[in-house]
Amino acid sequence: MKTDNSTFLAQQIVRLRRRDQIRRLMQRDKTPLAILFMAAVVGTLTGLVGVAFEKAVSWVQNMRIGALVQVADHAFLLWPLAFILSALLAMVGYFLVRKFAPEAGGSGIPEIEGALEELRPVRWWRVLPVKFIGGMGTLGAGMVLGREGPTVQIGGNLGRMVLDVFRMRSAEARHTLLATGAAAGLSAAFNAPLAGILFIIEEMRPQFRYNLISIKAVFTGVIMSSIVFRIFNGEAPIIEVGKLSDAPVNTLWLYLILGIIFGCVGPVFNSLVLRTQDMFQRFHGGEIKKWVLMGGAIGGLCGILGLIEPEAAGGGFNLIPIAAAGNFSVGLLLFIFITRVVTTLLCFSSGAPGGIFAPMLALGTLLGTAFGMAAAVLFPQYHLEAGTFAIAGMGALMAASVRAPLTGIVLVLEMTDNYQLILPMIITCLGATLLAQFLGGKPLYSTILARTLAKQDAEQAAKNQNAPAGENT
């Protein structure tokens, strides 16, 4: 009996020693091994949650569409039901954001940028459930939003959660795991690991602290999230447009013209986003009831729009291959483009939990395809393929709006598996970025972050002014 007790005690002592060794390793924040191990954990978690989010959104969409199919033969039921279902789903998202986690509204990417500079708080315990469930509601309603913004914010918050769980206290670990989660989130959303890395390095370059450990951690997290994504979804590109022909050298000037067009469109689009945000803010004034009802009305309209013109609703991933294949006329492409600009502004600027990457990619595809089809008529001697201009346009609007040309180029090439178009992509995206900068356009996410910080400072100043005199001394 004594032998059994001594054996049990010895086993317990060994377990406790192992736990203590692991705990001490994790608390040595500057140990590269500890941070890289945590980066792998963050990347794996982000990949799993990203896949779960994608499946959950698809499930909600299928349930909604299935309910509409059941009454498809009864128009007097179909139209009201389409409005009501989408309105209710959207209202869930708006309510959760406004009531429990206002920082979960919109794409969430500016929040991560602010957190990397220690200017915005990361409250993962409330952002994670609100962003996940709220995103299920708004994206499931058929609103013109993407899932990449939510997965980037979810990934960043998972990074902070892991940091808190393992009690890693250094500023370097806090910064590195937050950036790792954000990069892994973009990779998990688009199956684009290299774009996830470039997004952190390029788009978040003012906030990201370059050093050997942080770069290795970002690489590690992105690798793990990509592996998880491919285990569940396979290795095929998420946008199937087929293998397009190369762009002959004598046609490259046309891609520069396309870049110039997007260089003009990008700043205008950004300005419209900000103006629409101001319009919604004046309308609801922060009042939750008005905000939720407004969101329900927008969601319901998207539900109706999905019946009238399915291509004008939703994130746009289903629209991109159809448009790139040249199945629409130039006039119809421009009509859908204008319609989706309006719906993108309404959905994104209203503060719904959802991203703007996917809608921008769809807009770029529409305008790029229209340009390619028109160029094919004007220059028949070139034997142009409109799909190549669609691919170039996908990255160009993002480059002009977000001011991240490298990320736009690599993201589109990874998503479509058309790496042979890298030269026209570079020409188009570089032209769009340079002209947008020349015209005075500001990067969209940086501008949104600046407005958020200004609002935060104003609220803090008002709070300090209203506080009793004794509290300020």
Curated annotation (Swiss-Prot):
Keywords: Antiport, Cell inner membrane, Cell membrane, Chloride, Ion transport, Membrane, Transmembrane, Transmembrane helix, Transport. It is a multi-pass membrane protein. It is found in: Cell inner membrane. A motif (Selectivity filter part_1) lies at residues 106-110. Residues 109-116, 177-189, 193-201, 387-401, 402-404, 405-416, 417-421 dip into the membrane without crossing it. Residues 1-32, 117-123, 167-176, 202-214, 282-287, 439-473 are cytoplasmic. One of its GO terms (cellular component) is plasma membrane. A motif (Selectivity filter part_3) lies at residues 355-359. One of its GO terms (molecular function) is voltage-gated chloride channel activity. The record marks E203 as: Mediates proton transfer from the protein to the inner aqueous phase. PANTHER family: CHLORIDE CHANNEL PROTEIN. Homodimer. Belongs to the chloride channel (TC 2.A.49) family. ClcA subfamily. This is H(+)/Cl(-) exchange transporter ClcA. The lineage of its organism: Bacteria, Pseudomonadati, Pseudomonadota, Gammaproteobacteria, Enterobacterales.
